[in-house]
Amino acid sequence: MKRAAQASDEPLKKRKTAREESSDEDEESSQRTTSQDSSQSESLSDVEDHKPSFSRPSDSQNSQGSMAHNEASNKFAMYNNVSQKLMAKMGFREGEGLGKYGQGRKEIVEASTQRGRRGLGLMLKGFQGDLNVDWEDEPEPSAIEQVSWFPESSPEIPDSDELRDWMTIGEKKLKIDDEIEFCSENLLHLLLRCKTVFDDLEGEEMRRARTRSNPYETIRGAFFLNRAAMKMANMDHVFDYMFTNPKDSQGKVLTRDKEGELLYFGDVCAGPGGFSEYVLWRRRWHAKGFGMTLKGANDFKLEDFYAAPSELFEAYYGEGGIDGDGDITRPENISAFRNFVLDSTEGRGLHFLMADGGFSVEGQENLQEILSKQLLLCQFLTALSVVRPGGHFLCKTFDLFTPFSVGLIYLLYLCFERVSLFKPVTSRPANSERYVVCKGLKPGTDAVREYMFTINLKLNQFRHSDRDVIEVVPLDIIKGDTDFFQYMIGSNESYCAVQIKALAKIHAYVRDTTLFEARQADIRKECLKLWGIPDKARVTPSTSDPKNKFYELVKGSEMDSFNSRPTALNSVNLEKLQHVLDYRCIVGGGEQLFLLALGRSQIYTWDGKAPSRWKKLENFKMELPRDTLLSVEIVQELKGEGKAQRRINAVHVLDALVLNGTDVRDQHFNQRIQMVEKFVKAVSKPSRPDMNPIRVKEVYRLEEMEKIFVRLEMKITKSSGGMPRLSYTGRDDRHFLPTGLYIIKTVNDPWTMAFSKSSKRKFFYNKQTKESTYDLPATSVAPFYVCHQDRLFWAWEEGVRVHDSQTRINPDKLSKDDVVSFIHKHYQQ
């Protein structure tokens, strides 16, 4: 769940209805989606509203003609002739009671006004009359939304000294009704009055009316974890997919699927993780998420990501890493999260950050803005700490009436190219929720970040005192920026008016349970279609048998190639390597296996021998996205030497077949390696030392084989009895005991590669047609099955000399000098 452990959408029986002011996130499990939902305890008067009206009594019954008698008769005018005849048979006469002596009740028994679980006779003061707000002129519901941006900011970002002078300390304030600098007094007071009306109303009664009154209500969470995912889908579309498909200032896409870096994003204060589930559903293994939220009941629920691969998301909880508390208001947690993100993104930062924090303010709903001020500040501070220049930020806010809140918005306005305050249709209109959307972080914002950090230190210092930070930007500076000031007032008053109408509408729907929004189903379909979201139900992912899943993924093609074993390289077949440019080579460290992932820790391996028997990967802690098929080795990695040496089993990827459902077998070998490197980077979790690592093998060109021998050393291992053994050190300073060299043909017959001495360029040559071309011919690409079945393996066994310190040499076996001299002979630039 979110940081808001008890947001307004939670089905808490005793919660007051005014909690429309808190987040409307996690109610879908307790609510029905029918448009005419009504309580089982509806009053009789509500039921009567569905009956046909009764006709007046006949003229013969009005023969006395007295005014008093007419008034009495009018009491029964609502009943038809049949009803009156039945009463007449029982001896009923107007003005008299039933019974032998007319001793029965003379007045009509009034219909019950009891609703829900109210106490008998309880009359809710706010629901005895109208609110005198015309809500019926609201605009027609539509899936089309418009974005209004702040004017582009012209002021320069102040330096640290000037910013420090902006902070104003004063007496802590716990009232909102006098905050009229950024909203008209009449609108603010009317809004507070409309909220207060619901204070004594039972929560369930309010929720039923809200469900019927909101035309967008049945969109809910679709097939995602919760409604937050659909809010993100909604806003991603409205803002032209600037989050899931970011572009530079020239409109060039920054993160393509086949090439380019991962889409790095962050999600803070956002358990259980609906925002992230949407992003990962949209981009899958081409994205990597980092999250920080409160541990415990409000934590991320990654196991409930049914629509997207949660294995691509790494939760981090600030100081202490996975053992931290995730409290974003602690300065040390923000600093730790910043360092972790920068380390994980090669110092570049995130493409965008999402923040959706909130917490329960039960009983103090009107003060939500004031009570949430530090949370809002820390989310803004985190954005400036982890978002890269040009990156984006999206954060939930509530009312923005106080100078403190507006000052924070002004600081964002200075730091980003464009800023908007936006309320998506997936956010219920009766609450004060809206989102600040920031596009294009400007360079040189460190001074503002440090200023926000200082403000947070002050707020922590004042937490238990009557002092507080009341302004972060002087009011005269805000008012002096006319464009910003006018936009702020217009935005506040616009959303205030929308909220007032929505509250009045709910008030009317509480009073009349027959009212409902007839277009809910149509609007839902329109929105899902516009946002590109399939209209399907949320279902638990099905479990699969590994053997059946394997056949499903490979589609029965080239099955024999899986059983092929590598050809041993020797002096006889060394001639196969005469077209040197056709080959790549990889250092082996164990038996080649096929690895199949069915999601999270459901991982199986097969040695490639017939018949196929998939075995669960035991004694491994690793999580991989479902529908993934790789060619791998299980290698024991070593770090250090002697008694201090540490060992860990790792998965080393040789090649990729299917990546989270994406079949890459027909891609060029180099392309497959690039894609699986991207995939491995997305699933790796450096913050989890308890998990076994997964790495992609380093690939060398055959003509550059000598680079491999530079990485070979003789090292002492614990199991070697003090004798040095041949070791290969990888890119991450971990080494392993090499078993030999895989040599992989990446050019498909009849094509080969050669080097043109005249043009000093490599070109492709067709041995059958004699065609030559510098461009890569599609038919020259060797798919996986060709690479796999035509591979050679040069075993570095006893008697094979590949390191200068090795003294035992078998002249019948290929040594380093033999292979290197052969390569030099056939490759001359």
Swiss-Prot record:
GO biological process, one term: methylation
Keyword entries, A-Z: Methyltransferase, mRNA capping, mRNA processing, Nucleus, S-adenosyl-L-methionine, Transferase
Keyword S-adenosyl-L-methionine listed: yes
Binding of S-adenosyl-L-methionine, residues: 226, 269-275, 327-328
Residues annotated as domain RrmJ-type SAM-dependent 2'-O-MTase: 223-442
Short name of one Pfam family: G-patch
Entry's EC annotation: 2.1.1.57
Catalytic residues (UniProt): 231, 356, 396 (proton acceptor)
GO MF annotation, one: nucleic acid binding
UniProt cross-references to PROSITE patterns, sorted A to Z: G_PATCH, SAM_MT_RRMJ, WW_DOMAIN_1, WW_DOMAIN_2
Gene3D superfamilies referenced in this protein's UniProt entry, alphabetically: 2.20.70.10, 3.40.50.12760, DNA ligase/mRNA capping enzyme
A single cellular component GO annotation: cytoplasm
WW domain location: 745-779
Location of region: Disordered: 1-68
UniProt: substrate binding residues: 195-199, 210, 366-368, 431
Motif Bipartite nuclear localization signal per record, residues: 2-16
InterPro entries assigned to the protein according to its UniProt record, in alphabetical order: G_patch_dom, mRNA_Cap_2O-Ribose_MeTrfase, RNA_MeTrfase_FtsJ_dom, RrmJ-type_MeTrfase, SAM-dependent_MTases_sf, WW_dom
G-patch domain sequence ranges: 79-125
Catalytic activities: a 5'-end (N(7)-methyl 5'-triphosphoguanosine)-ribonucleoside in mRNA + S-adenosyl-L-methionine = a 5'-end (N(7)-methyl 5'-triphosphoguanosine)-(2'-O-methyl-ribonucleoside) in mRNA + S-adenosyl-L-homocysteine + H(+)
Skewed-composition ranges (Low complexity): 31-44
Span of the signal peptide: none
Location of this chain's protein in the cell: Nucleus
Bias (Polar residues) ranges: 55-68
PANTHER family recorded: CAP-SPECIFIC MRNA (NUCLEOSIDE-2'-O-)-METHYLTRANSFERASE 1, CAP-SPECIFIC MRNA (NUCLEOSIDE-2'-O-)-METHYLTRANSFERASE 1-RELATED
Summary of the function given for this chain in its UniProt record: S-adenosyl-L-methionine-dependent methyltransferase that mediates mRNA cap1 2'-O-ribose methylation to the 5'-cap structure of mRNAs. Methylates the ribose of the first nucleotide of a m(7)GpppG-capped mRNA and small nuclear RNA (snRNA) to produce m(7)GpppRm (cap1). Displays a preference for cap0 transcripts. Cap1 modification is linked to higher levels of translation. May be involved in the interferon response pathway.
UniProt name for this protein: Cap-specific mRNA (nucleoside-2'-O-)-methyltransferase 1
Source species taxonomy: Eukaryota, Metazoa, Chordata, Craniata, Vertebrata
